[in-house]
UniProtKB/Swiss-Prot annotation:
Subcellular location: Cytoplasm
PANTHER family, A to Z: HTH-TYPE TRANSCRIPTIONAL REGULATOR LEUO-RELATED (PTHR30118), TRANSCRIPTIONAL REGULATORY PROTEIN (PTHR30118:SF15)
UniProt-recorded Gene Ontology molecular function terms: DNA binding; DNA-binding transcription factor activity
This protein's name: HTH-type transcriptional activator NahR
Disulfide bonds: none
Span of domain HTH lysR-type: 6-63
Gene source species: Pseudomonas putida
Positions of the DNA-binding region: 23-42
Family: Belongs to the LysR transcriptional regulatory family.
Protein task: Regulates the expression of the naphthalene (nahA-F) and salicylate (nahG-M) metabolism genes.
Gene3D superfamilies in UniProt: Periplasmic binding protein-like II, Winged helix-like DNA-binding domain superfamily/Winged helix DNA-binding domain
The UniProt record lists the keyword Transmembrane: no
Amino acid sequence: MELRDLDLNLLVVFNQLLVDRRVSITAENLGLTQPAVSNALKRLRTSLQDPLFVRTHQGMEPTPYAAHLAEPVTSAMHALRNALQHHESFDPLTSERTFTLAMTDIGEIYFMPRLMDVLAHQAPNCVISTVRDSSMSLMQALQNGTVDLAVGLLPNLQTGFFQRRLLQNHYVCLCRKDHPVTREPLTLERFCSYGHVRVIAAGTGHGEVDTYMTRVGIRRDIRLEVPHFAAVGHILQRTDLLATVPIRLADCCVEPFGLSALPHPVVLPEIAINMFWHAKYHKDLANIWLRQLMFDLFTD
């Protein structure tokens, strides 16, 4: 069909439905009634001769044709919005914006307390939302603006993304403060003689630790596997297990959980923690402000 035959206001509803996946939420975000959103979707379906969205228990899922339209429509909407708001400024003191950051639970433990304390003074009405996404969904989320920044070791975010180094992370051995292993220097032999907690942090670079130890022939006695780091402090304080964790997490856990962080007997590769954002939002004033704040607070 010809573009002149399409009511472009319908694409605003389409674009918001791509993000919200629920008619009620889209109506609220656009300041419309639910019947108005439903009617707009009905008209767009008729114009494009495609269902566009199919109702599921997880919300409105886009059809293949809607998914095909998603990127160009989102890009066009963002370009138009930027053009219309070109002369507007971002004032953190009065803004009520919600910023969405993708990070692991380590990131939440390490970054959030300090960031939220500063935001209480510099941007008291702003909201922070954290998410965890797979590499592919994260790429799309950064591209369409549902995620503002991603923080971590994310080697798949390259083409189309900017990045900036925040800090370096090295690994230590974490255990309870009165653990027998703390009585003498931690050798590789003693390290391997105790049971271990292994954290399988899917979608992050921390799996490289296991890969490296396997490659150099180090075999730990794995007694427990967990999918995230948040439980490690609770587990170690009441067991004789050891855990290999990044120093930034250890710094946050030692005092609250009564733990000791020991130099690791294995020389493990350091990991770089970077901050990523999509090229489309490189000049977005709010994004620029948040990036600079993160850099000022956390860069080594």
